[in-house]
């Protein structure tokens, strides 16, 4: 169960263009030289963590060791079915969400990391830049 599942976004160096959370949900917009990727979580998310990529070096190193560094570097958006972040949310809520199949989603760019815990798949829209 503890595996990384990528979403096969077009290859490229992405940056975080926008992160928005409001009544309508959570939107992540990633941009590369060739593409714009919009990731929409239209419902409730159980946790959201946005950080500078360099601020989580220990965890990033653990992921590279566990999932293979080369694969990690090729994935801009992925999910982990079992993670320390999911366990943290479970502990902090005294197991309130344990009956749900929570997933740990990660948008990982060269500069930023956005992590979301949700029980459903997001909608992903990929547009070629003009």
Model features per residue range: what roles?
Residues 1-130:
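Surface-exposed, interaction-prone regions used to assemble/regulate multi-protein complexes
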């Amino acid at each position: 169960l503890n595996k990384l599942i990528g979403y096969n976004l077009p290859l490229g160096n992405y940056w975080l263009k926008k992160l928005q959370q409001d009544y309508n949900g959570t939107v992540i917009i990633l941009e590369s030289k060739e593409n714009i990727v919009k990731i929409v979580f239209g419902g409730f998310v159980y946790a959201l963590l946005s950080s500078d990529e360099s601020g989580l070096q220990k965890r990033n190193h653990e992921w590279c060791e566990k999932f293979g560094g080369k694969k990690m570097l090729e994935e801009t958006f992925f999910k982990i079915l079992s993670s320390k972040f999911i366990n943290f949310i479970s502990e902090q809520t005294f197991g309130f969400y344990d009956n749900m199949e929570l997933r740990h989603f990660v948008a990982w760019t060269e500069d930023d990391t956005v992590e979301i815990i949700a029980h459903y798949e997001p909608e992903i829209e990929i547009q070629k830049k003009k």
